[in-house]
Amino acid sequence: MIAKRIPGVEVLRVFAIFMVVLIHSTPEYTNGSGTNLAALILQSVSRAGFISFFLISGYFALNEKIVSLKKYYYNRVVTIVIPFLFYAYIHYFMVHYDFGRAANALSGFFSITTLADFLHAVIIGPAFNGSMFVSLHFWFIYWIVGAYAVVPFVGYVIQRIEPSSRLKSIAFLLGVSWLHLYVNRYFPNANIISIPFIADGWFVYFLIGGLLYGLELNKYRKYAFVCCAIGYVLTVFLTWFNFSMLSIYQAPYGIDINMVLCVCGFFIIFQTLRESFL
């Protein structure tokens, strides 16, 4: 069974947590803003750090040996869904009852109506709930629940791809993703036949994480530093270029080539850290 604790990857988890905090505490890049230099410097690294979570999740989840589907799904409900519902209910209550200061706060917390409204909001989801507020920041939980729901089936395929073919598989996934991404971004009016693509760029990172398992990553360590540097510089440049030169108000923070270089570089560097170094 794949080890659940690899020291270097644990350090990467901590780094990624700090990068999520950095994302939400630094300005976004916008035309004419006086904080754009800070945005370019900080957002360019924090976004890549955040995406590391998807590679880490795929690396472990897609290579897990699942013996019992019943036990697998039970464990995921207990460790992901139930804690989420518990925390989200408290969050929902605090938002709707003035952080517990409302006159009817105590009765509202134990109200069937509050519970029913909360479940309604959870089912609708953070993107479409309107006044039935569930924080947009919970989107990651919805994503991870969906990803883990298909892990037994996707992982079955991933685990049967030979190590010698895994880099080719990654190249294929990225080729399909980049073709769709860049044609639609830079040639939106091009009259081209529908291009197949994987709908969610985060899931591509998840798959890449799964495919990196079994590779001798130490061989790529020296290249990983170069990838990080190139990816970072490209992120800074493309963010400025898209906004200032092309009037495409979209930062390259998704499955873009710059992010892939930086994220994969981060993962290889941290995954290959020796315990003696830590």
Identify the function of each model-found stretch.
Residues 51, 79-83, 87, 172-176, ...:
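Hydrophobic alpha-helical membrane-embedded or membrane-associated segments
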Residues 4-16, 90, 100-105, 166-169, ...:
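Alpha-helical transmembrane segments of integral membrane proteins, especially early/N-terminal helices
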Residues 199-200, 217-278:
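Alpha-helical transmembrane segments and terminal signal-anchor/GPI-anchor hydrophobic tails
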Residues 18-25, 88-89, 172-186, 228-242:
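Aromatic-anchored segments of alpha-helical transmembrane domains
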Residues 2-17, 73-74, 78-81, 220-233, ...:
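Functional transmembrane helices that form membrane-embedded active or gating regions
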Residues 35-44, 190-199, 247-256:
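Non-cytosolic membrane-interface motifs at loop->transmembrane helix junctions
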Residues 54, 60-63, 80, 91-103, ...:
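Hydrophobic alpha-helical segments with transmembrane-like composition
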Residues 7-64, 80-88:
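Functionally critical transmembrane alpha-helices in membrane proteins and complexes, commonly lining
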